[in-house]
Every structure is written in structure tokens, then in C-alpha cells.
Amino acid sequence: MLLRTPTGRDNPMPTQLLMLPPQSEKTREWGTRLAAALPELDFIVAEDREQATEALAHAEAAFGTIPPDLLRHAQRLRWLQAPQAAPPAGYYYPELIAHPVAITNFREIYNDHIGAHVMAFVLAFARGLHHYIPQQLRREWKKLPQDAGVIHLPEATALVVGVGGIGSEVARLAAAFGMRVIGVDERRRDVPPGVAELHRGDELDALLPTADFVILTVPHTPETEGFMNRTRFQEMKKTGFFINIGRGLTTSLDDLVDALRAGEIAGAGLDVYEQEPLPADHPLWTTPGVLLTPHTAGYGPYLDERRYEIILDNCRRFLAGQPLRNLVDKARWF
């Protein structure tokens, strides 16, 4: 479907942006809204691969996922908006990385929702809910000793691994509860509000033993795959808690289960997993001290409107020749 303004001698052919398949009611709506807001652009909503292949010969910009066999038709493509904040494994491949196309993503739209989810895990562990929830299911009235099962947050340290938008929001919220926040980030050099110390990635192993909560927010990249393993869990405090809301492939679940059952860490809160859905027979389901949510940390209001605003902003920047928002380092996948 082509959403186009009339052309003529005084109105030359506009730049084309292709909405790659598959389409949804939302992407079709975006195409209509963008066409009304930006008459300088043609918006082509491709319903199938045949339409996408034909349109790619002329499109200078696109939204969605482009597989290798379609990429070879994209001779004019200069900008690709990824459909996620952190696209899944396989989105970036050698031919796409080598292609001159610039890629942007939807990072920043989930910061407040995921930040709140992380603090839900932190507060649950700090107040011993990982002990009391199983007791509730057993209808068992049993209090932990008054001085046990509680972490006084103003005396606790949170180690936030990955201090981008989400990590920065986690740091701000944790600091508001009085926690001392240490950040680890490969790229960031400015220290965001709430972070007491900011370190490089090669300092992580030395910092793990200092943290009461290790909070992983990093994306899945070649460098972070299997990032949290048995060795790193053993470096944590035995009273420490691990939280992962980044990407599942960054953490070895077998190693996590072994560490939990060996008493090497006190508990774990997970929203992402190596395999999703998490298989019903996975030992993580029955491992004590674990809180699991089914990849819902980013759920919340306003997400679709935030996505649209980023696309609209980047369309305007693209037309004006300005730097694009949320530009990705393709070789590093984020």
C-alpha cells in the first residue's frame, strides 16, 4: 500500500520510507499518521515479501526487519529503524553490518517501566518476599527472625551493569531508597544522577564481591553472550541477589541454578531467559530464592506512542540531514 502525496512538476517524487512486513494494525496506523505529518516522504506499507522486494529498489529508509535475501535489493537504503529497543539474535548479520545503512532502535521508551520492575525485585528480596510467597502457597504461617530476611537498603550496594537509559533509571530509583549505586559501563563516561561510582567493564570482577544486588541491564551482543556464568556468580556475596532484565542470552541459567543450589548467592530475579518461554521442566521453576516474570518488565502505558514519536523524530532528522536518534553501533549490536 502506497501512502503518497500528489507529485508533479512543482512537487517532485518524495523520499521513500518502506514499512517492511509483517504489518499490524499499529504499523498501518503509523504509516497513515506519518504520511499526513510528512508530505515530503512517501510511505510504502508492504504487506508481503513481493511488495517489499519491489519497493526496496527505490526506498532510502525502512522500518522493520530485513533478511539477507532482501538486503541485496536495498541499493539505495540509507536508514533502517529497528522494530525493537534491542532486536533479537539474528537481526544483525555480516551483510547488514557491512552495508552502509545506518540503523536506529527504540531504546529509552522502556526506561521508567523497567526501572520500576527492577525495584519491585529489589524490594521483594529486601523484605523477604522470596521466602514468604512459597509459604503463602503452602498456607504456612511462619515468621523469619526479626533480624533475618531483611536488607536495610540505605546500607546496601547495587551494582548496575550497563548504565544506559534503563540502568540510569535504575540507579536513580535505587539511590532514592538510600542505596549506594556503582555503575559498570563500557561506553559511558559521564556519571548519571544516583551513581556514586562509574567503572569500566574490565573492573566488573573486582566489584562483584562488593554488591548486595547485581543488576544486569546489558543487551545481547557478541561480548555479553554468556556474560554471567558460574565463575562470576561465585565472585558475588553469598548474601547477594542477581537480577536480569536485559537479555536472556547474557546469563547461563544452568550456572545460575547451580550457584543458587550451592548457596553461592542468595537469590535471583529474572525477566529474561536463554530460551523463551522457559520450559516447564526447567529446574529454575523449583529452585528456592527465585522470582520469575515472563519477559514483562517493559510492559506499561504509552509505549506505542513513544515508538511513533521516535519514528517521526527520526524521519524529520533524516529529511534534514541531521544526526539520527538512537543510532546503533552495528558491529556491537547496540
Regions found by a protein language model. Give the residues of each.
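Short beta->alpha connector loops at strand-helix junctions that form conserved
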Residues: 83, 102-109, 202, 246
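Rossmann-like dinucleotide-binding domain for NAD(H)/NADP(H)
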Residues: 239, 245-334
